[in-house]
C-alpha cells in the first residue's frame, strides 16, 4: 500500500546516500489536504482518495522513528523560509500559482496552521461574487481567476475568439496550450495575448493585495511555472498590489519576489519540520 511504499522510499533514500537509517531522528512528509500537524492525522487527501488517514502514526510504526506530517503548501513555504526567497524574514507568505493556488503563511518564524489546521487557503478567498464555480463548492475563488490553469483557460478562450492571433501559429493544438503561450505571444507584440496577460495579472494583483492587507508580511514569494517569467510578471503585480494596499503606514512595502527553490521547496521544508516546533 501507499504507506509501505513511502516507508520503503525513506529507507532507499537513506541507503543511496550512505546513511544508516538508525541514525535518522525523524522523517518529514508534505501532503495535500487537511493535516493535523500535532497528531500526523490527515483529515482528507482528495488526490489519493484518502479520508481520516492516520499517516503519521502508521509510518512511525513502519519506520521506527518520529514522523512529522504537514500540508504540502505549508511545507513549501517553510522551505522557502529557511533556504529560499523568504530566508531572513520573520513574516512571509508563499503563493504557488499552479493548477490551483497554494499558499503557506509564516508569522514570527512559525507556520500558521489555525486551530483546525486548515489556515491560509488564500486560493479560496472569493474575489468575484457569484463568479466561476470552484472545486471547493464556492464561486468566484481567487484560484479560478489567477492560477496557471485559469490563464490557460483564458488563453484558449481568446484564441477561439480571435483566429488571427499569432498564438495559433505558435501551437500545434489548442488542447496543448499552456500558461506560457500567452506570455510568449505578448512578447512578440500580439495584442490579444497582451490583453489576456494584463487581465490575468490584475487578478493575481487583487489576491496579493488581499494577502498584504490581511497579514502584512515582510515578503511574498510567488512560485509555480509562471514565476519563471520574472519581472514581466512581478513588476505589474507589485504595481497593482501597491495601489490597492491601504494599511501601509511606514512607507515600507513588502518584498514581492519569485520563489527560489521551485519544486524542491516542499522537500526541503518537510525535511526541516522537526526544527519548526
Feature locations, PLM:
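Short glycine-enriched, charge-decorated loop/helix-capping segments at active-site entrances
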Residues: 41-48
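Structural signature of FAD isoalloxazine-binding scaffolds in flavoprotein oxidoreductases
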Residues: 118-121
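Active-site-adjacent loop/helix segments that line or gate small-molecule/cofactor pockets in enzymes
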Residues: 73-77
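Short catalytic helix/loop segments, enriched in acidic residues and glycine
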Residues: 52
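Active-site glycine-centered loops adjacent to acidic/histidine catalytic or metal-binding residues
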Residues: 72, 98, 270
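Short beta-strand segments
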Residues: 28-32, 94-100, 104-106
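ATP-binding/phosphotransfer module of carbohydrate and carboxylate kinases, centering on a glycine-rich
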Residues: 1-26, 36-39, 57-67, 79-89, ...
Amino acid at each position: 500500500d501507499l504507506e509501505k511504499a513511502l516507508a520503503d522510499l525513506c529507507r532507499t533514500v537513506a541507503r543511496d546516500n550512505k546513511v544508516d537509517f538508525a541514525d535518522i531522528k525523524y522523517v518529514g512528509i508534505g501532503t495535500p489536504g487537511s493535516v493535523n500537524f500535532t497528531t500526523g492525522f490527515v483529515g482528507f487527501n482528495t488526490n489519493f482518495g484518502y479520508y481520516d488517514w492516520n499517516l503519521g502514526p502508521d509510518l512511525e510504526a513502519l519506520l521506527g522513528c518520529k514522523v512529522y506530517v504537514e500540508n504540502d503548501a505549508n511545507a513549501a513555504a517553510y522551505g522557502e523560509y529557511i533556504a529560499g526567497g523568504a530566508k531572513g524574514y520573520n513574516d512571509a507568505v508563499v503563493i504557488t500559482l499552479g493548477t490551483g493556488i497554494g499558499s503557506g503563511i509564516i508569522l514570527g518564524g512559525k507556520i500558521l496552521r489555525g486551530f483546525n489546521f486548515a489556515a491560509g487557503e488564500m486560493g479560496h478567498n472569493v474575489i468575484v461574487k457569484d463568479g466561476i464555480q470552484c472545486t471547493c463548492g464556492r464561486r468566484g475563488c481567487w484560484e479560478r481567476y489567477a492560477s496557471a490553469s485559469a490563464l490557460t483557460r483564458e488563453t484558449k478562450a481568446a484564441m477561439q475568439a480571435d483566429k488571427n492571433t499569432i498564438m495559433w501559429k505558435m501551437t500545434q493544438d489548442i488542447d496543448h496550450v499552456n500558461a506560457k503561450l500567452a506570455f510568449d505571444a505578448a512578447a512578440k507584440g500580439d495584442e490579444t495575448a497582451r490583453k489576456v496577460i494584463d487581465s490575468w495579472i490584475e487578478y493575481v494583483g487583487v489576491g496579493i493585495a488581499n494577502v498584504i492587507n490581511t497579514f502584512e508580511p515582510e515578503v511574498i514569494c510567488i512560485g509555480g511555472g509562471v514565476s519563471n517569467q520574472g519581472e514581466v510578471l512581478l513588476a505589474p503585480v507589485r504595481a497593482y498590489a501597491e495601489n490597492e494596499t491601504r494599511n501601509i503606514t511606514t512607507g515600507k512595502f513588502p518584498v514581492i519576489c519569485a520563489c527560489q527553490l521551485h519544486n524542491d521547496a516542499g522537500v526541503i521544508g518537510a525535511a526541516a519540520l522537526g526544527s519548526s516546533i
